[in-house]
């Protein structure tokens, strides 16, 4: 009697073929960028355009999380995102693989550009006065605005006790809501390292809050 080979098994093999590994969205994006960067660095304009198309919404969300409303900054999140995309395009011809994903390279540029925006805000303190409205405004009044600015300043000062890498991890994990795997992909490390960095960063923030008597001691 002649039997047919089971369709779940490959020819010449007694074992079924293994299913393709499931990749996260961040892994898929990182892989797509890594595929495009070599072609883009060789001068393919379409690949460069595709990189910007993929990168822009990612860095826009990152800038919005880091800069907030940007009321006291000279640049908005959109402005900084545009700067990041421009710097990324300018860096493509000189890009060399350094053992990390191209996505991690882009987030390195993003962190530097956001830091530049904060530095410029510290150097330039002129805030333009808006025109007076004709109708009563339902927006927050001067007291609410001042309190919100004070809270933002306190948060900014608190975050300065952390290293830049730890700040990046907290922004991505707690503000952007990324998973440890997504954060690891962005900064070029492992999910386990991300969790350790987050744990240490939060412990350092708690310690500083206790020093300032803003957090009660745990029994």
Residue ranges of predicted features:
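Structural recognition of an alpha-helix C-terminal capping motif at a helix-to-coil junction
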Residues: 79-86, 100-112
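Glycine-rich, flexible loop segments associated with nucleotide phosphate handling
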Residues: 72-80
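Intrinsic, short, N-terminal disordered tails of RNA polymerase sigma-factor systems
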Residues: 1-42, 46-61, 65-68, 78, ...
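Conserved strand-loop elements at the edges of beta-sheets that form or border functional pockets
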Residues: 53, 97, 108
């Amino acid at each position: 009697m002649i039997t047919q080979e089971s369709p779940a098994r490959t020819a010449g093999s007694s074992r079924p073929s293994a299913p393709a590994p499931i990749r996260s969205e961040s892994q898929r994006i990182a892989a797509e960028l890594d595929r495009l960067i070599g072609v883009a660095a060789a001068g393919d304009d379409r690949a460069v355009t595709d990189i910007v198309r993929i990168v822009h919404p990612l860095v826009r969300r990152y800038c919005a999380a880091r800069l907030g409303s940007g009321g006291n900054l000279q640049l908005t999140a959109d402005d900084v995102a545009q700067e990041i995309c421009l710097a990324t395009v300018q860096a493509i011809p000189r890009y060399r693989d350094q053992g990390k994903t191209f996505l991690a390279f882009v987030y390195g540029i993003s962190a530097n550009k956001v830091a530049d925006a904060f530095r410029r805000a510290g150097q330039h303190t002129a805030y333009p006065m808006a025109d007076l409205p004709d109708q009563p405004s339902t927006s927050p009044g001067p007291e609410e605005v001042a309190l919100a600015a004070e809270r933002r300043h306190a948060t900014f000062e608190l975050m300065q006790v952390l290293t830049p890498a730890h700040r990046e991890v907290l922004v991505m994990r707690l503000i952007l809501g990324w998973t440890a795997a997504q954060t690891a992909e962005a900064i070029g490390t492992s999910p386990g390292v991300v969790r350790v960095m987050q744990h240490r960063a939060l412990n350092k923030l708690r310690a500083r809050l206790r020093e300032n008597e803003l957090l009660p001691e745990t029994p």
